[in-house]
Amino acid sequence: MDFQFTHYQGNVSVKCSMEHIALANWFNTEVRSNSDKILTALSTAKSLIENQEKVLIGTEYTLFLNADEVMVRANNLAIESDEILEQDFHYYDEESLAFCGTQDFIHFLQSYVDFIA
């Protein structure tokens, strides 16, 4: 997972690789100005054991965490799988849904903590 933190005019923001845009959006809209939320997500991810799942609900995005994977999903992403779309139409959810390994997520958050130190 590729990402880059930048500091501009007193704010830290992150850019992520295309398949992880939802993770960047989560960070930039939900937690960048709230270190408690970052530390909560980091400690939650670090404390997960096998077959354990945690959910962290935010205003715009929700995190679904287990020992192997983290899913970031926009709260407004409500797709009914039985809903029929016109031919050649597809849902665009690249900015609303992202998956990464739990260790990658921990590395991402720890990199932020190191970046602001």
From Swiss-Prot:
A Pfam family (short name) is UPF0231
Protein name according to UniProt: UPF0231 protein HI_1724
Q: Which family does it belong to?
A: Belongs to the UPF0231 family.
Which InterPro entries is this protein grouped with? UPF0231
Q: Domain of life here?
A: Bacteria
